[in-house]
Amino acid sequence: MTWGSLPVIAQQALKAVDAPTLVWIRFLVASLVLFVLLGLTGKLPRPSEFSKQTLFLLVLGIIGISANFVLVAMGLHYISPTTTQVLWQLSPFTMILVGVGVFKEAFTHWQKIGLMLLLTGLVMFFNDKFGELFSLGSYAVGVMMAASGSMIWVCYGVAQKLLSKHFNSQQILLMIYFCSSFVFLPFAEPSQIAHIGNPFLWGCFIYCCLNTLIGYGSFGEALNHWDASKVSIVTTLIPVFTMIFSTIGHHLAPDYFAASDMNIVSYVGAMVVVAGALLAVAGEKVMGLFLRKI
């Protein structure tokens, strides 16, 4: 739910600060809080625990999460929060393709069906936007940013899972957040934060900072206790939450949150995309449970 609400709120925070500054402060706040918590409990990562493999995985995770954060944030200047989260469903498919191409995993029939549904759903979702996409204007730029951010996030997802054999989830996040904050420091303008005068925008800004800590902390813990497929089932529902939060936001504060520009075909397309992602990551489990019940 925190990931589902994030683009809705971040789009407002980006009216006060630019994307690199927002991404930098999110990483900085999260790393400082985690440093204090792990320091108090004596669970800070030790230098002796590092190896060439873990350092490589850390760099991979830093690249994945840093690029994802900034590309999606920049994309929100051009497209709606719901669009970013529908495109987020490219992540599980990219993860599957990495597994097939790199780790020689099988490409199951459920994954093939899921891929077909994803492509069909995306065509339906963008049914009234093809003119804007093919004109390669600002809307197309936003779509390409969000799509690229979703696919490169897989670098973080793979790194997080492999690093969990050596560190706990909070240690991994601390190292990735801390290093990522330095990546964005040269591009950030901290003075923008001091000039946020609107209390509503301040609230959105603070929420974005806390969201990083809560959302990725929960994701990391979930990977420690669940199979990756179970975690993926939950993440496929993110666009649904985003659509709900966008609708609620517009009804409560129409001056801040814009009305949805989606038609009925787009809504159906979004659901088809979610269904495709769900089948791809857990088709056999979901259908097996369904067949047992009937």
Model-assigned labels for residue ranges:
Residues 1-32, 80-83, 152-179, 228-230, ...:
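Juxtamembrane helix-loop-helix junctions in multi-pass membrane proteins
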Residues 2-9, 39-88, 123-124, 208-226:
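Specific transmembrane alpha-helical segments of multi-pass solute transporters/efflux pumps
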Residues 8, 34, 95-97, 101, ...:
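Transmembrane alpha-helical segments that form core, pore/gating elements
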Residues 16-67, 94, 98, 151-155, ...:
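Transmembrane alpha-helices of multi-pass small-molecule transport proteins
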Residues 16-24, 49-55, 127-150, 189-206, ...:
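Juxtamembrane helix-entry segments on the extracytoplasmic side of multipass membrane proteins
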Residues 25, 65, 69, 83-90, ...:
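Helix-helix packing/entry segments at the starts of transmembrane helices
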Residues 27, 127-128, 201, 236-294:
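C-terminal-most transmembrane helix of multi-pass membrane proteins
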Residues 48, 88, 104-124, 139, ...:
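Loop-to-transmembrane alpha-helix entry segments
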